[in-house]
Amino acid sequence: MFKKFFIAILAAAAFTLAADPVTVEARLTEIPGKMPSNDLYSYVYVYKYKVLKVVSGKLDAKEILVGVYNPLIARGKVKDKMADKSKGNVGEFKAKAKHTLKIVPLEGNWDGAVEDEYFDDESPRYLAIEVNE
């Protein structure tokens, strides 16, 4: 009984540590395709970023694929259930812009529609829970 309890505690601790956000400074390299309007449905749109610096946490990738919830709405202006995962001060996403991103794995943090033009790229997807200029 104690052994099962101990294993459950270790598993929960590992999951908690793995879910800690990573903060990076990165440049938005491209905006693929056309974003759907927000009046159709809520979605996460995947952008490609070049990592310039890891500010906190651990990340080895030079490029990352980052999903942003309803990117046509300015960060900090999202008022629905995803408001806590849509923080920041970016008003509009533009190619070549430098952002400070707080990211978590997309899987497990978003289960809705994903607009992802990088279907041939098997890199992990992240969700930006905060984006600042």
Roles of regions detected by a PLM:
Residues A8-I9, P32, D39, K79:
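A near-ubiquitous, low-amplitude feature marking generic local secondary-structure context
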Residues D20-L52:
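Structural detector for short beta-strands of small beta-barrel domains
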Residues M1-K4:
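Positively charged n-region of N-terminal signal peptides that target proteins for export
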Residues Y43-K48, L52-E133:
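Disulfide-stabilized netrin-like
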Residues F6-I7, S37, D84:
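Generic detector of short alpha-helix boundary/capping microenvironments
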Residues F6-A18:
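Hydrophobic h-region of N-terminal signal peptides that target proteins for export
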